[in-house]
Structure formats: structure tokens, C-alpha cells
Amino acid sequence: MPRLSRRVLLALASAALLAAATLAAQTGSGNVQGRLIDEHGSPIVGGTVTLQGSTAPQRTGSDAQGHFRFLQVLPGTYSVTAAAPGFAAATREGVLVSVGRLTALEILLRISDVNEELTVSGETPLIDPGRVATGQTFAREQLTEIPTARDVWALVQQVPGIQLDTVNVAGNASATLGGPSFSNRGSGNVAYAIEGATITDSYYGFALNRQNGGTSIFFDYGTFEDVEVVTGGSSLDQQNSGATLNVVTKRGTNTLKGSARFLYASANWQSDNTPESSSANGLQTNSTRFIREYGGELGGPLIADRLWLWAAGARQDISLSPTTFSETEVPVPETATLEPWSAKLNAQISSPNSLALFYQRSDRSQYGTEVGPKRPPETRVNLLVPSDFYKIEDSYVFASDLFATVFGAYQKPRFQSLPVGGLDRDIEYYGDQYHQTYFYKASQQPQWQGNLHVSK
């Protein structure tokens, strides 16, 4: 009897795990689903459907109801070609696949005695009828057109219901965690993910005097393929009750291609709206001295249709003049450097099996920061925040309506706040201000995670 009970408990636990995994939806891919019909609206059975993008083509067939489905499709723009005996082939161009979403299609095949093909160009449906979650997805094309700072925090501010506690003017606060909150419930209810793996670091938010919630990884805006922000109706695997930000980076394709960029903003390009009364007293408001960013990416095939590599790197330098809080105070420049590096290796092991390896290194250095009304320049600190992130993911499509994905990820965030005044001086507090030096903070919190995702 005890042995039977253990078996029953094991079976129930396995079923619970499978059910939870089935509901998981925080991934780095989407699905394509459709139906083949003839001119009378009847389903076409046994048709061949091909999904063609920038990597290896995928093929499937239509069932007794004319339905077809492609699972675990990476974000991007594709063409879908359908063919069946006795019908003219038809191609749907410009099919957009977004992370975490289902793209629905209906393809009409016309009866034909000759070998011909019809190409249809049109907009991909923007509404997923089977999607419960609410939020917004930004595709690569949108990311280049939205007039915001090149910063993920400024991007998520475009989503209704999300607010930031930091004003980011043209990227002058890109080195600062934006502190996004959802529905005015504090920054602790926003979670972060990259390639579907959670990167929320509760200590990092706490160390910056924010509520729990933050991330020590700073993103390279130029590497985004898709950014998904989920604000409601989330799956059970979401680890908070608020919003979730999921970033999917680019990848190598069958075409060797790359890009480079250089961006610069100068203090001479800014206007000054400081009141004359304040200027006459010698007070200075915060301003941007300069913002400089350069970076590049390169990706392509190692083995066509089988193995692809993509890598990117960037550096952003930000220099600010902080606000002065007395007539005699001389503003000390605050500088920051962000250096994110990324690499992704994708492999098509077999037709149903794919493998992805991802690595990102994020180095953030901020010097002379945290000056404020109670923090004169002598209490400035230097922030050093290096972080490494590794992920391996394997996906297998068992049938047109069943696939599984398993991944493991490791994150090693470090945080160090070094007072400019040194560690050998006492912290004094008088006149409603700190003096001489400030507190030293340090943290290192390695994090492991794994996930099994089964969907039908």
C-alpha cells in the first residue's frame, strides 16, 4: 500500500508539472496556424505548406479539416506557400511572427489543371483570437521608428499602465535603472526576462533604494529582435503579479550581414530653460554634457540551413552635470559607461529538433553619482555592475500540435558601490546632510534556473 501511494503521488506530481509546463508562455518564439480552403470554403486535405524565412525552411501538411501549424517559430517576417494536387499553389508574403503570439492565416487555393502559383501580399492579422494575455509587442521595425531614447526603460513607458520614476531625456538616464511600475503598485511588480529566462535581481533594486525588483543586466538597444511587455492575463509561470518584460535578441541567418552605428549628442545642441532668478544666484540645473554610443553586429551561416552564429557589441558613454544645491557648490561631472556584449549560436540538429546557445556580458560603470539635496559631492559613489548571463535551450516538435522546450540558464550579477570619500573616514550627518563619505555596498548573487515547456 505505501508503495502504491508513492506511485500515485509521483503520478500526480508529474501531471501537475506537465500541466504547469503546458501553461507556460514566456518564450522567445511564436506560432503560425492556418487553414487551407478551396473556392467553396471547403477544407483541403493533404496539402503541403512551407514556411520560408531567413533560415532553413519548415514544412508541414494540412489535416482532415485543412488545418496546419508551425510551432516554435522565431520572430521575424516569413512567406507561407501552400500547394495541393489539382490546385494552383499560393504564397502569402510578409507574414509577421512576434514573440509569444499566434499568427493566424487562411489560404485560398484555386482549382487549376496547369502548374501555376499565386502570390498574395497583405497585412498579417494584428489580433490573436486565442490570446488571453494583454500588453504590447515591439518588432524590430517598430524599434527603429519609435521616437524615444535608445533605452529599454523608455520603450516600456509606451505601454499603457506602466510608469517610470526616472525622467530619461534623450538617453541621459540610460545608465540608471528606470524603476518601472505597473498600475502604481511599485517597481517590485515588474519582472524582467531575456530569451524567455528570468533575469530579475531583487537585491539590485534594493541596493538602489528601490522596492524589490530590478535587473543588473543592461541591454544593447541595437540587438533587439522583439520586445514583449505582458501586463495582464499572464501564464502561471510568471513570477509576479504585475508586468513582465521579455527581450528577444537577433540571430544569425543564411545571409551574412552586419551593421555599425555611431551616435552623438552634445551640450551645444540643448536649450536652457533655467529661470533668470536661479541663474543670477549661481545655481545650475542638471544638464547633459555629451552622450556617445557606438556599436556593431555581425551574423551569418556557419553551415547553411544548419548552423548560424550572431554576435554584437557596443559602448555608450554618458557625461552629465548634476544640479547644484548651493550658490558656492561647483558641479562635479557624473559619468557612466555601458558595455553590453552578446553572442548567439543556433543549430538545426534535425527537422524537428533545434538548439540555441546564448551569452551576454553587461558591464556598467558609473562614477560620481547619487548627488542630491542630502548628498553633497563628497558623498558621491562609484557604481560597478558587471553581469554574465548564459542560456542553453533545446526544442523538439513531436507533431503539428505538440512540442516541448527545455532550457537552463545561469546568471552571475555583481554589484559594488564604492564611496569616493573612501572607507577610512567616518560618515557624519549634520545640517540635514551626509558628510565626508558614504556607505559601502557589495553583492554577488549567482542564480540558476531551468524550465520545461510543453504545449499542445
Task: Enumerate the predicted regions with their spans.
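Transmembrane beta-barrel wall of Gram-negative outer-membrane proteins
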Residues: K257, N286-S365, L383-T405
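Periplasm-facing N-terminal accessory domains of Gram-negative outer-membrane beta-barrel systems
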Residues: P2-L4, L10-S14, A21-E141
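Membrane-embedded beta-strands of outer-membrane beta-barrel proteins
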Residues: F68, P180, A243-L245, G296, ...
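Outer-membrane beta-barrel translocator domains and adjoining extracellular loop/strand segments
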Residues: V95, A207, Q270-S277, S321-E329, ...
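Extracytoplasmic loops and strand-loop junctions of Gram-negative outer membrane beta-barrel proteins
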Residues: L208-G213, E228-V230, E276-G282, T324-E329, ...
